[in-house]
């Protein structure tokens, strides 16, 4: 008998029973459907295991189960999560924070599909202008063309011409023969009417214009039928174009069924959406193929020091003088300028330098004595730049390409000026704006423009554009609601942070208007200023109010308090976590004593330091920074302090630190190839000796990379195993315990632990290796054990467990202890780096740097290190960062988290808005000093935070 009460419960809640994925301790729990639920807890407490690896994984598995047996055969069996039962599950959509799109052609506009609607708008409602004359393009029907001919040429003798060739080289012998066979007697070649004769041909090396003379007639009512027939024929032969030549004045007019310039006769094809796509051959700029930039050879890198002579190595790709052909060629070239190889480049004429770089027109004479020949030898010289370009080509070796890369620079395409589109696409306008100009506007500015553009459209355009504009405005509004008003549609997806990518996907989902869906999000508040948090929370509530369930893995205080339901995982991380320590409303949670609730209700807090550090009295000054939206700012970075760079999203923080300061320092200390954005000067480099950029990029690109290999501790672990009696008896070397080389690894999977099944048009599927069952090594290697554990068992240990296991091996302990100190005790030593979040990758890098010796003169740069961190984890992280500063180092942190900001010694606040409204230095000083400022949004939040202490 059916229990209808059970069915009612299923409707109301998502019921999870017996979840044991990763560290989950056989938990049972319920999450109300149709609610905004926050899952919180310490890093490694089991939040992601519950939300993504249990609920989402089961939802995805059930979806695949609906496929036909034939389709499932290709997909392989998706492993069922280790859970007894999940009921009440809707279709699940996961929106994670990883920036997976590395395609340079992907932009905010293409990801959100807003650019697709803009393309449709310009194709249907755009007004075309000639790129030659700037005149508005016109197009006519055949009836209109006949009326115009009657009006303009009544009673006059005219030639009706059909254009066949426009400014192209060739002898066109075959074309003239084809025209003659069709019965036409005359052609107009380069402005002159000529009779077609047998074997007629032109100069093949010159550009030509060719029109066939369809008819020669007088425009009268009597000849109306003949004129109509001739116009139709001309249109057919000329692919929609025809020209009228006045026999008396020899003036020419152009007519077309297609869009045409009335002055020059230039014609465009009927616009379609693909004509405005930089990913389509019909729309892309022919020079840069739609990328907006080209790779050029940087002359300043080829000749970096002009005070040197070529003999001394002024030309970097050649080095110092060698007795070889290229130096003989340059020597011969310089003779005509009365110079030698020992003349400093600065004293050479500019023409000589250009010929050295780009080649000489005439052949050069190499003296017979140099080549031990009986007579002089004449050679062509193509130049250094040509040689480097040859090394860049696809068929050159990887070594040659890498060598050539050091002399290259990426520059804006000189043809499209970065617009990515061809001239034709850029000359369609709506209210004086082309599609590129719209895509460079900040989203807030574009939204305002689109709200008022209909007032400036003609009635026909307004009718056509109405629905498209409505769709674009709706989607832009969603982007505004999730705090992305400072982005532009042409912003490359590659340059977006994880938080920005996630919020774009969130806005796209809200725009899709789906209902009865379960959304699972991973820390959507990453990278958001406190000001924008409320807008994000409202967007999530809007998603809920559509009739969906929203689960958010989050640490943000505002998000927790705004939720309908909170699940707190804990009590600690790793093996000590995996339990639900609280589940209920935020109001109920504030009354409990879990670690999270104590931080929420104020019983526990991250304390403000008793006094701010004074620093070492030295400073780094960056002057005139003007990259992206920076407005020529001068910024002081006092050394020996914890510096926090703050400001709303898009205010210029990352541009200032990651794109300007960090590349300057990397170039100075490590000869980095990354070019800093424009700036005037940097002062104070003599006070520091190295820079360490601890970013959130993955540790490695493949699952073979893991915390053990990245930190270098895996080499020590392998050496430990090599020293064991069993390994010595068998004669094993360190390579035996590596999963990257043959010998000790499982050869069935190549040491991966899994096999990759390529799905062609679907994402690859990973299946555990049936031979080693994911252990990566062969049976013989796994027989060598230390304290009863094989090398595979060690890689499967959490950092916390490994610290206990290796407590008597100082060389290993010192490296893994630091991973524990930065709050990563819950991750596994051999966990593939591709499964680590951006914040986790950043902390592995931080731990690696901490385990190295420092001189007390290092600058550490961190971008949002609190990503993925609980209040307690932030406290641990700040202890680590403070240790670095206490040793005399300087730590520069880009951060929105008030717990970090209030602990800084010095704050640099950027703003006041994002995008074009930002890029200014608003205030700087201690948190107490900045809190008194009346500029921007940050001071108000700092003031509230300090008052609550």
Where are the regions a protein language model picked out?
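Conserved phosphate-binding elements of NTP-dependent enzyme cores
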Residues: 1-949
């Amino acid at each position: 008998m059916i229990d209808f009460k059970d069915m009612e419960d299923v409707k109301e809640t998502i019921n999870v029973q017996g979840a044991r994925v990763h560290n989950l301790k056989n938990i049972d729990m319920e999450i109300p459907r149709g609610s905004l639920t926050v899952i919180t807890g310490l890093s490694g407490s089991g939040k992601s295991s519950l939300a993504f690896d249990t609920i989402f994984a089961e939802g995805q598995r059930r979806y695949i189960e609906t496929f036909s047996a034939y389709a499932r055969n290709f997909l392989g069996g998706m492993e069922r999560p280790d859970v007894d039962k999940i009921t009440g599950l809707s279709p699940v959509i996961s929106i994670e924070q990883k920036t997976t799109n590395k395609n340079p052609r992907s932009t905010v506009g293409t990801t959100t599909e807003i650019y697709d609607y803009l393309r449709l708008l310009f194709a249907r409602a755009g007004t075309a202008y000639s790129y030659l004359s700037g005149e508005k393009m016109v197009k006519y029907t055949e009836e209109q063309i006949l009326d115009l001919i009657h009006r303009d040429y009544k009673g006059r003798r005219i030639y009706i011409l059909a254009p066949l060739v426009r400014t192209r080289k060739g002898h066109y012998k075959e074309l003239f023969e084809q025209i003659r066979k069709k019965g036409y007697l005359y052609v107009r070649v380069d402005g002159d009417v000529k009779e077609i004769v047998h074997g007629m041909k032109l100069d093949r090396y010159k550009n030509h214009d060719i029109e066939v003379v369809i008819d020669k007639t007088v425009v009268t009512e009597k000849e109306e039928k003949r004129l109509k027939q001739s116009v139709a024929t001309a249109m057919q032969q000329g692919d929609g174009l025809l020209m009228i030549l006045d026999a008396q004045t020899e003036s020419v007019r152009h007519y077309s069924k297609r869009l045409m310039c009335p002055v020059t006769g230039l014609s465009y094809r009927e616009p379609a959406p693909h004509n405005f796509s930089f990913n389509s051959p019909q729309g892309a700029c022919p020079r840069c193929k739609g990328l907006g930039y080209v790779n050029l050879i940087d002359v300043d890198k080829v000749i970096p020091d002009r005070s040197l002579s070529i003999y001394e190595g002024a030309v970097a790709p050649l080095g110092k003088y060698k007795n070889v052909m290229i130096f003989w060629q340059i020597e011969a070239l310089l003779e005509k300028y009365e110079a030698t190889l020992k003349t400093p480049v600065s004293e050479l004429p500019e023409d000589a330098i250009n010929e050295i770089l780009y080649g000489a027109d005439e052949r050069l004479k190499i003296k017979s004595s140099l080549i031990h020949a009986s007579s002089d030898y004449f050679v062509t010289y193509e130049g250094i730049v040509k040689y480097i370009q040859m090394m860049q080509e696809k068929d050159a070796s990887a070594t040659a390409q890498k060598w050539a890369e050091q002399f290259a620079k990426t520059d804006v395409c000189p043809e499209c000026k970065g617009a990515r589109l061809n001239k034709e696409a850029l000359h369609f306008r709506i209210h004086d704006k082309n599609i590129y100009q719209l895509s460079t506007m900040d989203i807030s500015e574009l939204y305002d423009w689109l709200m008022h553009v209909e007032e400036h459209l003609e009635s026909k355009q307004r009718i056509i554009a109405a629905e498209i504009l409505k769709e674009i405005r709706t989607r832009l509004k969603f982007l505004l609601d999730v705090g992305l008003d400072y982005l532009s549609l042409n912003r490359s997806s590659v340059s977006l942070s994880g938080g920005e990518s996630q919020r774009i996907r969130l806005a796209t989902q809200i725009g899709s208007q789906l209902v009865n869906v379960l959304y699972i999000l991973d820390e959507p508040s990453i990278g958001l200023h406190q000001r924008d948090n409320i807008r994000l929370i409202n967007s999530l509530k809007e998603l809920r109010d559509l009739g969906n369930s929203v689960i958010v893995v989050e640490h943000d205080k505002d998000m927790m308090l705004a939720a309908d339901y909170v699940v707190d995982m804990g009590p600690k991380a790793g093996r000590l976590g995996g339990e639900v320590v609280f589940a209920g409303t935020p109001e109920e949670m504030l009354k409990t004593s879990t670690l999270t609730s104590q931080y929420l209700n104020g019983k526990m807090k991250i304390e403000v330091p008793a006094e701010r550090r004074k620093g070492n009295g030295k400073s780094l000054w960056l002057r005139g920074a003007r990259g992206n939206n920076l407005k020529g700012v001068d910024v002081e970075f006092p050394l020996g302090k914890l510096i926090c760079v703050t400001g709303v999203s898009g205010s210029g923080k990352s541009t200032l630190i990651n794109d300007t300061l960090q590349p300057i320092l990397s170039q100075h200390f490590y000869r980095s190839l990354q070019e800093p954005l424009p700036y005037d000067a940097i002062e104070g480099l003599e006070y520091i000796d190295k820079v360490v950029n601890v970013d959130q990029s993955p540790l490695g690109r493949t699952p073979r990379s893991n915390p053990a290999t990245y930190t270098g501790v895996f080499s020590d672990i392998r050496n430990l195993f090599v020293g064991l009696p069993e390994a010595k008896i068998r004669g094993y070397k360190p390579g035996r315990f590596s999963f990257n080389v043959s010998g000790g690894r499982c050869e069935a999977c190549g040491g991966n632990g899994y096999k990759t099944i390529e799905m062609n048009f679907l994402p690859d599927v990973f299946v555990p290796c049936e031979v080693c069952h994911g252990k990566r090594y062969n049976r013989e290697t796994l027989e060598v054990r230390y304290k009863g554990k094989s090398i595979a068992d060690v890689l499967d240990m959490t950092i916390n467990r490994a610290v206990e296991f290796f407590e008597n091996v100082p060389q290993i302990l010192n490296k893994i202890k630091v991973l524990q100190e930065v709050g990563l005790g819950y991750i596994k030593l051999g966990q593939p780096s591709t499964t680590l979040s951006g914040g986790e990758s950043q902390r592995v890098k931080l731990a690696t740097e901490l385990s190295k010796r420092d001189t007390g003169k290092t600058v550490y740069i961190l971008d949002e290190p609190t990503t993925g961190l609980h209040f307690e984890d932030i406290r641990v992280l700040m202890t680590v960062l403070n240790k670095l500063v206490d040793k005399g180092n300087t730590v520069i942190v880009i951060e929105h988290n008030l717990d970090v900001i209030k602990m800084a010694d010095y704050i640099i606040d950027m703003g006041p808005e994002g995008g074009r409204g930002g890029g200014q230095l608003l205030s700087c000083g201690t948190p107490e000093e900045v809190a008194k400022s009346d500029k921007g949004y940050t001071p108000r939040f700092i003031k509230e935070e300090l008052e609550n202490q």
